[in-house]
Amino acid sequence: MSVHKTNDAFKVLMNSAKEPIVEDIPKKYRKQSFRDNLKVYIESPESYKNVIYYDDDVVLVRDMFPKSKMHLLLMTRDPHLTHVHPLEIMMKHRSLVEKLVSYVQGDLSGLIFDEARNCLSQQLTNEALCNYIKVGFHAGPSMNNLHLHIMTLDHVSPSLKNSAHYISFTSPFFVKIDTPTSNLPTRGTLTSLFQEDLKCWRCGETFGRHFTKLKAHLQEEYDDWLDKSVSM
């Protein structure tokens, strides 16, 4: 597949963020770049119903266009770090990484599990959910404010609209929070991933570039996982 098509797929991912992030963006923010749309949550978290937790340090918000059954964003409110690239955060600001991990695994774990049950099934145990949630950054984020993705593995969602969406969360483009610094990718080197064949994250079956077939399969995989998990 040509490099031109690769670039087109990457542009699809980056341009998809132009969808509005909030339902009612205040007038003072409406003319700013779409890449700054997460800023409203950091500055005025109390104003938005999709914010489920905030304190002086972080904000936890439901992604308005989730790419899985459950898809949350955890954002630092530190003005000195919110615009730092996630790969630089992973490499040079380990204290922030550790703080975010401590929120996910500690103070916010109950909220995250409850949110997952609300989105998937109330019958799921914390143990089942713990193995079905991934946490990480995009190597090439489409939004300016640093945001950590906390999401279930299913990738079953109407907002998962194209191959680029799926690949961005199921390839090395999605950098898991526990990735060693020695294994971090170099910025700007992963765009070739967007030309690869689509592959089920769970069973490994490949679908070429047939996104519609993949989406149907992902629903089947989710249904199978859920049936087995609630029967345990």
UniProtKB/Swiss-Prot annotation:
- In the UniProt record, which is one GO cellular component term? cytosol
Annotated phenotype, changing F34A: Decreased affinity for DNA
Indicate the enzyme's highest-level EC class. hydrolase
- Please name the source species: Schizosaccharomyces pombe (strain 972 / ATCC 24843)
Q: A GO term (biological process) for this protein?
A: mismatch repair
| Impact noted for substituting H147N | Loss of enzyme activity
Instruction: Outline what the protein does.
Output: DNA-binding protein involved in single-strand DNA break repair, double-strand DNA break repair and base excision repair. Resolves abortive DNA ligation intermediates formed either at base excision sites, or when DNA ligases attempt to repair non-ligatable breaks induced by reactive oxygen species. Catalyzes the release of adenylate groups covalently linked to 5'-phosphate termini, resulting in the production of 5'-phosphate termini that can be efficiently rejoined.
Write down the EC number. Answer: 3.6.1.71, 3.6.1.72
User: Which protein is depicted?
Assistant: Aprataxin-like protein
Quick check: keyword Metal-binding in the entry?
A: yes
The record's subcellular location field reads:
Nucleus; Cytoplasm
The cross-references to Pfam families, in alphabetical order and at most eight, read: HIT, zf-C2HE
Catalytic reactions of this protein: a 5'-end adenosine-5'-diphospho-5'-2'-deoxyribonucleoside-DNA + H2O = a 5'-end 5'-phospho-2'-deoxyribonucleoside-DNA + AMP + 2 H(+); a 5'-end adenosine-5'-diphospho-5'-ribonucleoside-2'-deoxyribonucleotide-DNA + H2O = a 5'-end 5'-phospho-ribonucleoside-2'-deoxyribonucleotide-DNA + AMP + 2 H(+); a 3'-end 2'-deoxyribonucleotide-3'-diphospho-5'-guanosine-DNA + H2O = a 3'-end 2'-deoxyribonucleotide 3'-phosphate-DNA + GMP + 2 H(+)
Gene3D superfamilies of this UniProt entry? HIT-like
Q: Where is this region: Interaction with DNA?
A: 63-67, 138-149, 161-165, 209-212
Q: Per the record, where is site Interaction with DNA?
A: Y41
Domain HIT, residue spans: 38-160
Subunit info here reads: Monomer.
* Record-annotated active site: H147
Signal sequence range: none
Record InterPro entries? HIT-like (IPR011146), HIT-like_sf (IPR036265), Znf-C2HE (IPR032566)
The keyword DNA-binding is annotated on this UniProt entry: yes
Positions binding Zn(2+) in this chain are: C200, C203, H217, E221
The observed outcome of changing H147A is: Loss of enzyme activity
Q: Which GO terms describe its molecular function?
A: DNA 5'-adenosine monophosphate hydrolase activity; DNA-3'-diphospho-5'-guanosine diphosphatase; double-stranded DNA binding; double-stranded RNA binding; GMP binding; guanosine binding; mismatched DNA binding; single-strand break-containing DNA binding
Keywords (A to Z) from UniProt: Cytoplasm, DNA damage, DNA repair, DNA-binding, Hydrolase, Metal-binding, Nucleus, Zinc
